[in-house]
């Protein structure tokens, strides 16, 4: 039996190709880490089924984006993959999952950053708000779509985020305190 998230992935990524492989491998790593962190923190009462589903779908919008290095040959700028995914999931009747899509980029994107950097996004805050949104965004920072077999350390994740500004680093460091150092869910290489 197919899971709900798998049916959505199959609808938008019907062919067994490199992009589908990248999406599923990356998303599974994010989901596994998010679930491992959530299970260590039962006092947070996180919705584990939702965490898994939303983590598996958080990057669904990459198919619409132009990022040839990861086999994405759409027309939208990559920075918009969260918004594109949110649009797709809202059309699927998944508004809660859509919020994860549109709020996971970087450590969230502020209205101010969109305005000052002239990003091709609506002028509003796209910051993770719920604990589940924050957890999935946090877990995502430890994996890239170009090195699928590697899990970043906290220091490596911070270095990746640093180029986008101090406010994202502040949010990320707060998540390190809230959710803890991540366990290795992939063998370090």
Label each residue range with its predicted role:
Residues 8-11, 33, 84-85, 138, ...:
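A general alpha-helix detector
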Residues 43-150, 154:
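Divalent metal-dependent catalytic cores for phosphoryl transfer on phosphate-bearing substrates
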Residues 161-189:
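Charged phosphate-binding loop/patch that engages nucleotide di/tri-phosphates or the phosphate backbone
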Residues 17, 21-24, 129, 163-166:
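Charge-dense, low-complexity intrinsically disordered segments
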Residues 4-11, 50, 96, 100, ...:
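Exposed alpha-helical structural elements
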Residues 1-14, 80-103, 181-189:
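Short N-terminal secondary-structure initiator segments
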Residues 1-78:
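Acidic/His-rich, divalent-metal-binding segments that scaffold phosphate/diphosphate chemistry
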Residues 28, 32, 95, 177-180:
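Generic structural signal for well-ordered, non-transmembrane alpha-helical segments
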């Amino acid at each position: 039996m197919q899971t709900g998230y798998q049916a959505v992935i199959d609808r938008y990524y019907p062919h067994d190709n490199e992009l589908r492989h990248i999406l599923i491998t990356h998303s599974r790593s994010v989901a596994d880490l998010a679930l491992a962190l959530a299970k260590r923190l039962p006092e947070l009462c996180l919705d584990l089924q939702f965490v898994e589903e939303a983590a598996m779908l958080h990057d669904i919008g990459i198919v619409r984006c132009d990022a040839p290095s990861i086999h994405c040959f759409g027309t939208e700028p990559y920075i918009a993959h969260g918004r594109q995914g949110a649009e797709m999931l809202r059309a699927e009747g998944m508004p809660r999952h859509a919020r994860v899509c549109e709020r996971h980029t970087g450590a969230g994107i502020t209205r101010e950053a969109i305005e000052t950097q002239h990003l091709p996004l609506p002028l509003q805050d796209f910051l993770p708000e719920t604990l589940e949104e924050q957890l999935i965004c946090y877990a995502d920072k430890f994996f890239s779509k170009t090195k699928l077999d590697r899990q970043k350390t906290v220091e490596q994740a911070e270095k990746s985020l640093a180029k986008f500004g101090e406010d994202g680093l502040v949010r990320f460091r707060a998540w390190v305190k809230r959710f803890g150092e991540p366990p290795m869910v992939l063998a370090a290489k």
